[in-house]
């Protein structure tokens, strides 16, 4: 009876290499599906995996086939309905499958979209691919770590794509040498004895036959030692190492005034949740300062920032003044990379908008690496947007974006934090 022992600890990931190849090959279609799917999630469900749909025509392999139309000559099996040279009506053409939208029809056939699941890590990797904090500078004190993949020797477990052929063959040779060295020494002794018996007088036929049987048995046992075994396999090991970069702080300023209705607040929260996930996944030890404001600004913790029901009028400058105070108290611009993301519906007391312009231009923008303003509204822009447009024309580290619908959130987020070319700062 034969026994098969599977020593692979990663047997469930035997097709991981094919999965990674598929994700690379259809990355653009997968990212498009992810950007559509994120808009359908609740505010608190941004971090789990996702079921991804790809149109079947996008993953079809190229092939040569007969086009529709034209004249064709085929040989069909004979039957009692047709004879030689009869003309056969062309069959009805089938339509392509799709998402299920459209009207019903009696003819045609097709295929549904290809649907598969991606894990949480794959989802977040694709979600934040090619994003980075703009103008990040290495300051004197380094506490912010950015994770990068490095080679880290070899491991006994891994995916087939990372197998080290040379190291595996070295292990195979060492194992076969260790397992057969005693047998080969014994084989050499038996062959020497056989040669002596064959040349002896008188002939010792029984002893000669015994030696030949022992030699054949040893050779068979040596041959049964496998050339390569799963025990020999070694895989290139990779690990993520924290590389010192610069310490950074992100200020999150959210308008919670009475003009911000619940759908608008939800869109602002979605944006900030994306920002939080991006920072926590890409960097380590990033400080985040949460500021909520209506007529008064208040520094709060994460729980209160996302779930507090407090509301009131609108004075945007109160949040900017509080941010300026916190920077002066805790975050020296010479030691910190300072970032800010402000979300509002643009509704502000008219006399306060010029004050916001002055605070930003004189106190905040000269010391921050990047300041982004997101206006969430379906209405026409008001005085705050116009003041910020003047700032954008003057300062390279100031950006403004407009969100009208939930589906605008992710494209705006990527536009604000897309990787830029290396710059000297």
UniProtKB/Swiss-Prot annotation:
Family annotation (Pfam families): DUF444
Compositional bias annotation for Gly residues: 92-105
Ranges of compositional bias, category Basic and acidic residues: 68-90
Family per record: Belongs to the UPF0229 family.
InterPro entries for the chain: UPF0229
TM helices/strands, residue ranges: none
Protein name as annotated: UPF0229 protein ETA_15540
Superkingdom to which the source organism belongs: Bacteria
Family annotation (NCBIfam families): PRK05325.1-2, PRK05325.1-3
Region annotation Disordered: where it falls in the sequence: 60-111
